[in-house]
């Protein structure tokens, strides 16, 4: 095992700082447009460019060679941490937040598309801060690193390692031979979805600014809102159905969505994971509708269906918007909510969570084990889309699921040590690892009341969940650092 090429990592980080500084220019323009102080944004852009220049200088003598898996894992994790560390500056410089820990939490929650917030009220924030919160989620949706791989092919052979570290999971389709081509097309469809959603939201009761912010946070399944009451503040049936549709789309495999809009829709509709995810969402919606109807939550059947659908899709896609106070829906729905947080969208989507494909493999493997109890010599391979998964892939999925669940429960236990309640600890740990945003209980709307240890732990859980556990946990093992 060769030593880690830190010059390679420095060069990636340097390029990412320049990309992020360039992207923040749009927020600077928004500040000028709304006659807000440009100083926080100019200062932060300057820091991005200065740090980027230092890192590029450090990586200037990079020799062309193929990057290892370790370097890809370390680079991606470092990108998220560095951009969150610099990206938190506007919150402090504008006075929106005074605690560096709170500012870091808000930023990494944005970049990981979790959507948990330390703000108790957001409606008084400057327009530029709202746009930055939304923009962090939009960038984190498909992945800042994927964006860089798409536009900066100088990474050469290392591009695939960066891409793989950022987008771990079951992949069925390598529809283009070059990783940079894959990334470019993913970002093209991502941009198209964003612009379509902006127009559709603007047609409704939202003004243009709200439409832009919510389009950015919906298509990325992030969930930040410009309103304290989230989507309920708009009191619009049209808006709720439009957002529910696009949250569902955000939970689909983006590669298959690309095929669907380029003349091959059957690739999407025939995909086994897509069908499972759709049935899962519809089934949870039906059960929830029946439950809240029996509870007498809303006077009309349409109201019960709409609120059930919205909350199921927002949880099932890891978005985190809200039209209702789901804590009041009772423990039965809480269990449905936790299950939705566990599954959370398809592989290759912007959603967090275990992913529908892994959950489906678990079910199939469990079914095969039942059959083996009756017929011990029966050969029962696990199939996905008619293709047999190798034993090593199935074992990897099982290992991932065990680690995923263990991370949630260890995280919940540590949160309980910091004087958090049982329900709140379980829900917010699950929410952080699955990047779902708001939890159940005292942290349903904000984690402002959490202690410093809890907030720091949640930052770690959000990052581990966004990079699908193995990437971050692997870096913490002694074996990772051996030559």
Question: Where is each model-derived feature located?
Answer:
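Membrane-proximal intracellular helices of multi-pass ion channels
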Residues: 1-483
């Amino acid at each position: 095992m060769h030593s880690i090429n830190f010059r390679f990592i420095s060069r990636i980080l340097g390029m990412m700082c320049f990309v992020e500084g360039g992207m923040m220019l749009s927020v600077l323009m928004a500040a000028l447009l709304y006659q807000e102080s440009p100083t926080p944004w100019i200062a932060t852009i300057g820091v991005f460019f200065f740090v980027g220049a230092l890192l590029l200088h450090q990586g200037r003598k990079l020799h062309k060679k193929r990057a290892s898996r370790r370097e890809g894992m370390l680079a991606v994790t470092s990108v998220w941490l560095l951009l969150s560390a610099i990206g938190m500056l506007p919150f402090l410089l504008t006075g929106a937040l005074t605690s560096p820990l709170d500012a870091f939490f808000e930023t990494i929650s944005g970049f990981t598309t979790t959507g948990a917030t330390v703000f108790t009220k957001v409606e008084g924030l400057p327009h530029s801060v709202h746009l930055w919160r939304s923009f962090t989620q939009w960038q984190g949706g498909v992945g800042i690193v994927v964006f860089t791989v798409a536009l900066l092919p100088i990474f050469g052979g290392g591009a695939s390692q960066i891409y793989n570290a950022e987008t771990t999971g079951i992949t069925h389709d390598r529809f283009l031979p070059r990783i940079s081509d894959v990334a470019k097309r993913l970002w093209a469809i991502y941009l198209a979805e964003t612009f379509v959603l902006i127009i559709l939201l603007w047609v409704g009761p939202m003004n243009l600014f709200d439409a832009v912010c919510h389009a950015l946070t919906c298509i990325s399944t992030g969930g930040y809102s410009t309103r304290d009451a989230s989507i309920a503040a708009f009191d619009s049936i049209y808006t709720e159905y439009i957002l529910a549709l696009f949250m569902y789309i955000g939970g689909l495999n983006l590669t298959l969505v690309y095929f669907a809009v380029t003349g091959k829709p059957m690739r999407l509709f025939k995909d086994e994971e897509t069908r499972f995810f759709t049935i899962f969402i519809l089934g949870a919606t039906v059960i929830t509708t029946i439950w809240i109807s029996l509870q007498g939550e809303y006077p009309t059947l349409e109201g019960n269906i709409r609120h059930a659908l919205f909350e199921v899709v927002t949880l099932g896609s890891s978005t985190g918007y809200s039209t209702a106070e789901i804590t009041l829906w009772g423990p039965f729905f809480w269990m449905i909510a936790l299950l939705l947080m566990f599954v959370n969208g398809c592989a290759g989507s912007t959603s967090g969570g275990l992913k529908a494909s892994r959950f489906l493999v678990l079910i199939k493997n469990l079914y095969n084990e039942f059959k083996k109890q009756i017929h011990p010599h029966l050969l029962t391979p696990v199939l996905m889309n008619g293709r047999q998964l190798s034993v090593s892939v199935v074992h990897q999925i099982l290992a991932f699921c065990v680690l995923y669940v263990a991370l949630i429960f260890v995280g919940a236990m540590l949160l309980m040590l910091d004087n958090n309640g049982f329900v709140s600890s379980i829900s917010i740990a699950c929410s952080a690892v699955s990047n779902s945003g708001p939890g159940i209980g005292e942290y349903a709307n904000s984690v402002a009341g959490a202690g410093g240890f809890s907030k720091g732990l949640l930052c770690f859980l959000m990052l581990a969940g966004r990079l699908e556990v193995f990437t971050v946990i692997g870096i913490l093992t002694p074996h990772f650092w051996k030559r």
